[in-house]
Amino acid sequence: MALVENLQQAVDALRKGCVIAYPTEGVFGLGCDPDNQTAMLRLLAIKQRPVEKGVILIAASYAQLRPYVDETQLTAEQLTQVLASWPAPLTWVMPASGDTPSWVRGQFDTVAVRVSDHPVVQKLCLAFGKPLTSTSANLSGQPACVTQQEVMVQLGNQIAVVVEGKTSGRHGPSEIRDARSLQVLRQG
């Protein structure tokens, strides 16, 4: 495991199917290429997370998320509300497109997506050219890591790269809302 400032090393690791850790708004996240099934299964094994739960996709822009979302199942008002809320630490559960891999959406016909305002996430997703998975960096039953050092202690031997940086200082995970009902599914 390497601690890197250079985002290109993280992008190279992602392209090779590795799992990385990176700072987000509130905690460090674990990420991989959402379209790489081997990488996703590796990430889920590290987290001890069942594939049925699905994972969040995090991106630099909605354009990066659009291939994973079925906009035809949303009204113009619903889509406008979602887009007006970003970038922010706010995750929306949206209808999944037919191209969204089952290992991303889990047992659902939806996908959880977020456009982050964190500068490292923005740069990383732009350099990678697509969204990353975003799930809290921690082992099952352990608190989420909020510093690079915590990531290295808890997960260092299981991930390829830790991207240097700090969280934005938010406490806890992002809020999650349903794009169709606008209901809050997880308080942020």
From Swiss-Prot:
The keyword ATP-binding applies. It is found in: Cytoplasm. This is Threonylcarbamoyl-AMP synthase. Residues 4-188 form the YrdC-like domain. Its main location: cytoplasm. Its EC number is 2.7.7.87. One of its GO terms (cellular component) is cytoplasm. GO terms for molecular function: ATP binding; double-stranded RNA binding; L-threonylcarbamoyladenylate synthase; nucleotidyltransferase activity; tRNA binding. PANTHER family: SUA5, THREONYLCARBAMOYL-AMP SYNTHASE. It catalyses: L-threonine + hydrogencarbonate + ATP = L-threonylcarbamoyladenylate + diphosphate + H2O. It comes from the Bacteria. One of its GO terms (biological process) is tRNA threonylcarbamoyladenosine modification. Required for the formation of a threonylcarbamoyl group on adenosine at position 37 (t(6)A37) in tRNAs that read codons beginning with adenine. Catalyzes the conversion of L-threonine, HCO(3)(-)/CO(2) and ATP to give threonylcarbamoyl-AMP (TC-AMP) as the acyladenylate intermediate, with the release of diphosphate. Belongs to the SUA5 family. TsaC subfamily. It holds the Pfam family Sua5_yciO_yrdC. Keywords: ATP-binding, Cytoplasm, Nucleotide-binding, Nucleotidyltransferase, Transferase, tRNA processing.
